[in-house]
Amino acid sequence: MTDQVYVTLREDQDKLWNLFHYHKNEMIVTKSGRKMFPKLEYVVRGLTPNKLYAMMLHIEPSDDHRYKFSSGEWVKSGKAEKHREPKKLWHADGVRSGKEWMTNPVCFDRVKITNCAESTNASMIFLHSMHKYTPVMSIYESPSESPFSVPQPSTRLVTSVRLTYTEFIAVTAYQNDAVIKLKIKFNPFAKGFREGSQSDRKRNSPSADDSTTDESSSQVSSPQPKKSRTVSVSPPLMPRILPTMIPPPPAINPLFYSLPYFSHLAATGNFPPVPFQFPFGLPCFSPMSFPTPPPSLKNVKKEEQEDIEQEINVV
């Protein structure tokens, strides 16, 4: 009997995805990878409780077009780049029973999207910037009786789910101000786009006007010369040369001066290296060493590190 599986998003995430979809959602792609927001948290119903399943996610192109943001909206700008076979990622929980999958939402929060085609990170999916994509979750029935087995591509496909309102356009910088406001409002980690950072975003955006000036410069009454965009480079950090640390001479008992050997050393100032091994021939003395503790460089190194950190912070 075929499972009648029903898949949707968790209620709060479902509302967010629909809200973003209304404004044509955008997702940032970077070389180091970026997690998606809103999250993909699927709610699965209809699985056989005692059967074993594995969940897989891939992101496929929504169409064969390239897009650009022009006059406040996304428009088609040509044919899409040649797409490679979508990378498919198994859920980190591996193989679990239908009862376990249906108990909690299936969350793919470890997946990151990147624009680096050479990335070998197992949790990253490569996407072309300025292209539209749709996430797809697939459910496979596992033939193994062990819940600890590794999912295999040959397992039977139960269903694949494509939710049209989860599609998005991959970008290297957000283009739509409405999307930015939604990201700031609902994403607690969108600190890079809080107040005061939108001007920076527009300078990095390929569709923004580079002639825009800062608000502070427009408030100056007298004309000011344009400041050239120069990069402030701090002078190279020179290694600090520590003064030569000479260990103090060992404390010599005055009794030793009566001995010929030590009286000669006291006159010349050439004391034996420490630790000094006393000869067995001297009476009343142990052959154990009497070392003088070396000077501690711990405080010197600590002060040097603090100075370097202060220089780095000032730059």
UniProtKB/Swiss-Prot annotation:
Record field: compositional bias (Low complexity): 205-225
PROSITE patterns per record: TBOX_1, TBOX_2, TBOX_3
A molecular function (GO) term: RNA polymerase II cis-regulatory region sequence-specific DNA binding
Effect of loss of the gene: RNAi-mediated knockdown causes about 5% embryonic lethality with 1-10% of hatching larvae displaying posterior morphological defects. Defective intercalation of dorsal hypodermis. Simultaneous RNAi-mediated knockdown of tbx-9 causes at least 48% of embryos to fail to hatch and those that do display severe morphological defects and die as larvae. Simultaneous RNAi-mediated knockdown of tbx-9 abolishes muscle expression of vab-7.
GO CC terms in record: chromatin; nucleus; transcription regulator complex
Chain segments annotated as transmembrane: none
Chain residues forming the annotated DNA-binding region: 11-195
GO biological process, one term: embryonic body morphogenesis
Pfam family, one: T-box
UniProt-annotated stretches for the region Disordered: 193-235, 293-315
Localization annotation: Nucleus
Primary location group: nucleus
Role, per record: Transcription factor. Involved in the control of early morphogenesis of the intestine, hypodermis and body-wall muscle. Involved in regulating expression of vab-7. Appears to have partially redundant function to tbx-9.
Protein name: T-box transcription factor tbx-8
Species for this entry: Caenorhabditis elegans
